[in-house]
Structures are given as C-alpha cells and as structure tokens.
Amino acid sequence: MRLTSAMCRRGVGLSLGAFLACISTLAATPVDPSGAVSLPAVSIPYSIFASDEARRQFVESMMDPSAPPPGSSIEATRSFYDAFNSNLVSRMRKRYAAVIKTERIGGVNTDVVTPVQGISPENQKRVLINLHGGAFMWGAHSGGLVESIPIAVIGKIKVITIDYREAPEYHFPAASEDVAAVYGALLKTYKPSQIGIYGCSAGGILTAESVAAFGAKGLPRPGAIGTFCGSAVDVKGDSAFIAPILDGQLFAEKPLSAFDLLYFKDVDPNDPMVFPGASTTVLARFPPTLLITGTRDFAMSSVVRSHELLTQAHVESELHVYDGMWHAFLIFPELPESNAPYSVIAHFFKQHLGQ
C-alpha cells in the first residue's frame, strides 16, 4: 500500500506499521549533524492539563503591554514591579490572613510573616527564610511578601523574607553575604536543622548560592531548601530555547543567561559559589532540596539538571514539574497550579526540618 499525506492525516484503516510510518513521515524535520533542529512555523495549543484559571492568567500575562521594555531605567523597572507585586500582595492577603512586621536581622532589612491563626506547635522552634525573585534587581519587600504569605499561612510557620542587596548598585556576592548575615543571626536562636530556605527565580539561584557560601564560611547547612524556577546551574538547555516560543515570544538565537544580569558582572562562570552545580563536592554538602518548575518556564532545563546533579551527589532531591506553567507562576494566588505547590512546599519543610 502506498501511503499518501491525506491517508496519514486521516489515520483511518492503517496498520500499526503504516501508522508508525506516517508519524515518521509527518514529523520529519531536518536535523543537522550537531543535533540542531529547524522548525517550521507552528501553532502550539495551551496545555490540556492546565486549569482554566491558568489559561486565562497565561494569556493575560503574555499579552500585558505595560511591563517596561528592556533598557528601561532601574527606577522605572522597580516602580513597575513594586506596583505589580503590591497588587499580588493584596490578592494574597484576601486569601491568606497574615501578620507582617519589619525587622532588622543581622544588619539586614527583613519582613517577618506569621499566620494570624498562629504558628503550629510543631513549628514553634522552626523558621523559613525566603529569598525573593526579581533578576537580582527588584522584588524587595513586596516581591518577598508575595512568596512568603501563602507559605507562612498554609505551613503555619514563621517566614522571614530578606531584602538583600541588588544590582546595579551591588554585585555578586553581596546578596549571598546578606543571606549569610541573617542566617548567622538566626543560628543564635535556632538549630541549623530547624531553619529552611527557599526562593523563586533569582531567589532560587540565590538559595543555592547561599548554601554554597555557608560551606565556604564554615557555617552549618540548613535543614532543607527549596529552589523554584531557578537553581544550581545557569539557565541553559532545551527550555531556554523552547519556552520563549511557548510563551509567545520571538525565538532567540542566544537565550538570556544569568551571566547577562548586571548582578553577575565580571564573575567566573565556573565558580561554584555562583552556580554550585559546577562542583560535585559543593553539591554533596546540600541539605534535602525541593525543586519546582513548569513546562513553559525558560529555567525548566536548569532546574531539571540541578535535580539530576543533586541526585548524582547523593543529596535527597524532590522535583515537581507543572504542565503548561510559565516562569514564576507561583506568584498568582488564584491558580490551582499555584496552590498545589504551596502545599507541597509546606509539607516538604514539615517533613525535613528538625524539632
């Protein structure tokens, strides 16, 4: 039987062998010797596994024209994201009743978030540190509250979010030095096993950096950590190319690297204090690690690779990948796909932090 393209498209009355031949025929795409694939123009539907709420938020986020364009002043960028995050904080507080107070710890400004209903008995001697996202340039205060409020309330635990130093005023390793200062101060009250650290995007990268820095400074490792939409290796791999397309952006021949960020000016890309995945020895000192990402997150491959490297280093590592979810999707409180990881995060620290 001679296969035609029409028969393949219909797929009716074909044997298994013919059906597989059709797949091969229809899916054939030029692949060069390096493994690079040239793709034709395609229309990719949104994930059938994602919620209606996620679909609406995805469209709204990707079509929002109000974000400042690349090259905008740092003042304009910070102003935009502070307003953006402040709106999210208001939405968070309608769902999650929290008490917020500012406190200077270890010489660093922080916001301390606790649940209105009180900290659970098992968490009285536990604390979480949040490291906010924002490309190491924005996210102080409001961005940290977005990431801290739901975890504090769902987990019934105290969360301290740190306003670490950012670019362009400061560069690596200023942020991890601030985290170490707060962590060191908390060690006067808590055992290291009672302290957890987590962050999203830049905060996920900073969480991994901070654990590496603790080891270099002779500080004990914390009880557990979470790195979300950013982790122990640079933003590379398939998702760095594919996710922008899935998010409706133009294809980039050279995707953005963390080393393009102002914060990492003039750093050594092989320095394990920047990306601990560069050293198995450094990774082997990591505590149990929770990793979260989405299939439309440009950092997905780096998070998956971090999980793989942690596993190879015999570190307990737990990976969750949410279908159809984009970078830092956890900041939207209305999504079922955000509420699911909130519970995962709370449970992970409940299971791994000491009493």
Regions found by a protein language model. Give the residues of each.
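Short, solvent-exposed secondary-structure boundary motifs
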Residues: 1, 28, 88-95
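Bacterial N-terminal signal peptides that target proteins for export
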Residues: 2-15
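N-terminal intrinsically disordered, low-complexity tails enriched in polar/charged
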Residues: 4-6, 29-42
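Intrinsically disordered, low-complexity repeat segments enriched in small/polar residues
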Residues: 7-10, 26, 117
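Bacterial N-terminal signal peptides
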Residues: 13-23
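Bacterial Sec-dependent signal peptides at the C-terminal "C-region" and cleavage site
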Residues: 22-30
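Alpha/beta-hydrolase superfamily serine-hydrolase fold, recognizing
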Residues: 31-35, 44-73, 94-355
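Phosphate-/polyanion-interacting regions in eukaryotic proteins
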Residues: 74-86
